Amino acid sequence: MTIRISKLGHVNLRVADEETSKWFYTEVLGFKVAEEDPEHGGVFTTLGEDFHTLDFAQHPNPEAAQKPKAGQIGLVHMAFQVDSHAALREAYIHLLEHGVEIHHATNHLNQRSIYFNDPDGNGLEIYYELPYALQLFPEGRGDEDERLEVSAPGEPLPAWLFEDWPGPEMKARIEAIRQQTQAEAASKSDTKEAVPA
């Protein structure tokens, strides 16, 4: 028997400066402050679905604290999903407008992602995932990730942000899976109704 975890509840980050982290996650990424505990320290933020999603604990000695380094054991990144490729483009532009350096972007075939760091150096990802991603790649994606061009603040935006993505072939595959999924759901519903109580 295993523990039956229903979902990931929240993440708590130790930060060099609670106020800087609060500003970054609320003003740049759109989190809302759910609660602050000035007496004991701590800022609790939410995306609106739960009481808190991401919390910050002030490091007791921020001058001595070390930022995470690439390649060390620990958190690689936290990922935040958006609902469309247009929303990913808006996020990219918004990050640049706030002076955030985007390290890289990737086309994972079933999703496109942009990667950057928070003020403490924690890795973050914003991504748009295609509908029916599991059904599109039932055998897995393999290692077919494609690096995408990125731009710095003030530079021209990369062309992939403005592509019609996914293209016509992938859209046709998604539509076929959607229709098949609906047909299977309708068939199950008809079967349940046909069974006498």
Residues covered by each model-derived region:
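Vicinal oxygen chelate
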Residues: 15-20, 72-73, 79-123, 128-134, ...
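Short connector loops at helix/strand junctions that flank enzyme active sites
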Residues: 51, 70-75
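Short beta->alpha connector loops
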Residues: 37-38, 61, 107-109
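Short glycine-biased active-site loop of nucleotidyltransferases that positions the nucleotide triphosphate
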Residues: 44-48, 66-69, 115
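Flexible, disordered linker segments and immediate boundary regions flanking tandem C2H2 zinc-finger modules
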Residues: 136-142
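Short beta-strand/turn micro-motifs at beta-sheet edges
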Residues: 1, 62-68
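Core segments of cupin and vicinal oxygen chelate
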Residues: 14-58
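Short, solvent-exposed beta-strand edge segments and adjacent coil->beta transition regions
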Residues: 6-10, 73-77
